[in-house]
From Swiss-Prot:
This is Membrane-bound lytic murein transglycosylase F. It catalyses: Exolytic cleavage of the (1->4)-beta-glycosidic linkage between N-acetylmuramic acid (MurNAc) and N-acetylglucosamine (GlcNAc) residues in peptidoglycan, from either the reducing or the non-reducing ends of the peptidoglycan chains, with concomitant formation of a 1,6-anhydrobond in the MurNAc residue. It comes from Maricaulis maris (strain MCS10) (Caulobacter maris). GO terms for molecular function: peptidoglycan lytic transglycosylase activity. The keyword Phosphoprotein does not apply. It is found in: Cell outer membrane. Residues 268-456 are annotated as: LT domain. The N-terminal domain does not have lytic activity and probably modulates enzymatic activity. The C-terminal domain is the catalytic active domain. Pfam families: SBP_bac_3, SLT. Murein-degrading enzyme that degrades murein glycan strands and insoluble, high-molecular weight murein sacculi, with the concomitant formation of a 1,6-anhydromuramoyl product. Lytic transglycosylases (LTs) play an integral role in the metabolism of the peptidoglycan (PG) sacculus. Their lytic action creates space within the PG sacculus to allow for its expansion as well as for the insertion of various structures such as secretion systems and flagella. The active site is at E314. It is a peripheral membrane protein. It comes from the Bacteria. In the N-terminal section; belongs to the bacterial solute-binding protein 3 family.
């Protein structure tokens, strides 16, 4: 089990566990902590699993991820830091919780009737759908009666086994295989490689996986919405009450919604052609320029994945790209912008990346101070696309219409109005194709997320 000490950041919740097999001796059980001892030690021990929707392991820093942010936020509410213990599999996670090796289990755990009989859970913080994921052109059981025709492999100890057992009551020929592990992602990759016909994954993971492996398809939903919650050690006096109070506050304050948007709201409608092209170009174009993106990011407060994602949206990583309006290169710079940032050859990959990154940094610094957090970056990216003047106009219009001029979500709804004569005629910078920066930012966020998780 891998361990990370971590500091506090955003929000959370999660849940799960299973009984120990009757043929194995039960694990030794530690004496339970109390909330007071947790605070005295300054540490909340969080059991979790590695995967795109829970915890992402970073070679050069602490882990990141949806569940990491949630757990960090809850730990901060207690005045402590979170230490993450990463289990190798779901059964290991459940055993560790039963043995008292952790205070909470936060790993995208589905709150099922079987688990509820054995474990204590936090309030529900997210809902997902269990989906049957298969390979394009392969076995595609869109009807339940066709499920026995498929070679199905699922995660050992998962809620997916419970789902299949329930289906098997009426479809008695149904069979499936299981594999141990902490995430369904390797099973999705196995389906993509032809090692199995289908697997089951939560909808937010399936959505992510299809953007890395475009030949995967969702054959059908197997459940309605399923609740996710944290499991916790019920022997710790006051922990359940603390979780209930914190989740209620996190929901009321919009923290759960914000975190969900940060990690899972970045994907728009699925476009098979676009995703397949992106995957090909990650393989055959990105390696030529990755070092240049990394070097540019080292000098600025941006991740290399962000710069690479922006360049892909601009030019599909084509250094000779040129538009009808005369912008050129990987970062599609205008002649005046190139002169402003001090480059003389817009088609030179290194110069283009350095110049584009410098220009984005300049825009970022010019965003009003009242715009904070991720919204500041989305604002700067939109300005790169449509111009800072039009972004200022959008802020003015947002204010007139009673919207929050500092919120990217609100501006994303206001910007398309810049093509409406009733509005742009009253603004300083006039007409703009305001839907374009909205799509521009959305696509960069999607590509950035895929690049950041490419090594998972």
């Amino acid at each position: 089990m891998k361990t990370w000490p971590s500091r506090a950041v955003s929000l959370l919740l999660l849940a799960l566990a299973l009984p120990v097999g009757c043929s194995e001796p039960p694990p030794p059980v530690r004496d339970p902590d109390t909330l007071a001892t947790i605070r005295e030690r300054g540490e909340l021990v969080v059991l979790t699993l590695a995967g795109p929707t829970s915890l992402i392991e970073n070679e050069d820093g602490p882990p990141s991820g949806y569940e990491v942010d949630l757990a960090n936020a809850f730990a901060a509410s207690l005045g402590v830091t979170a230490r993450f213990e990463v289990a190798a599999s779901l059964p290991d996670l459940f055993d560790a919780l039963a043995a008292g090796d952790g205070h909470v289990a936060a790993a995208g755990l589905t709150l099922t009737p079987e688990r509820s009989e054995r474990l204590a859970f936090s309030p529900v913080y997210k809902s997902v759908t269990e989906q049957l994921v298969c390979r394009r052109g392969g076995v595609n059981p869109t009807r339940l009666e066709r499920l026995p025709d498929a070679d199905i492999v699922v995660l050992e100890g998962s809620s997916y086994e419970e789902t299949l057992r329930a289906i098997g009551v009426t479809h008695t020929a149904l069979r499936w295989r299981t594999r141990p592990g902490g995430s369904a992602m390797p099973l999705l990759e196995a389906v993509d490689d032809g090692q199995a016909d289908c697997t089951i994954a939560d909808s937010h993971l399936a959505d992510f996986a299809r953007r890395r492996h475009p030949e995967l398809i969702v054959a059908r939903n197997l459940t309605g919405e399923q609740p996710l919650a944290w499991a916790y050690d019920a022997r710790i006096d006051g922990l359940g009450e603390a979780l209930s109070a914190w989740f209620a506050t996190a929901h009321a304050d919009g923290l759960l919604e914000a975190l969900d948007e940060t990690w899972f709201g970045r994907f728009g409608d699925y476009d098979y052609v676009d995703v397949a092209r992106f995957v090909r170009r990650v393989e055959n174009r990105l390696p030529r320029y990755r070092r240049l993106f990394e070097a540019a990011a080292d000098e600025l407060p941006f991740e290399w994945e962000l710069l690479a994602a922006q360049a892909y949206q601009e030019s599909h990583w084509d250094p000779d790209a040129v538009s009808a309006t005369g912008v050129r290169g990987l970062m599609m710079l205008t002649l005046s912008t190139a002169e402003r940032v001090g480059i003389d050859d817009r088609t030179d990959p290194e110069q283009s990346i350095v110049g584009g990154a410098a220009y984005l940094d300049d825009l970022y610094e010019r965003v009003p101070d009242s715009v904070t957090g991720p919204d500041r970056l989305w604002f700067a990216l939109a300005a790169y696309n449509v111009g800072m003047g039009h972004m200022y106009d959008a802020r003015r219009l947002a204010e007139r219409l009673g919207r929050d001029k500092d919120s990217w979500d609100d501006l994303a709804e206001i910007l398309p109005l810049l093509s409406d004569p009733a509005h742009y005629s009253t603004l300083r910078y006039g007409y703009a194709r305001g839907h374009e920066p909205v799509r521009y930012v959305a696509k960069i966020r999607e590509y950035r997320a895929l690049l950041a998780a490419q090594d998972l």
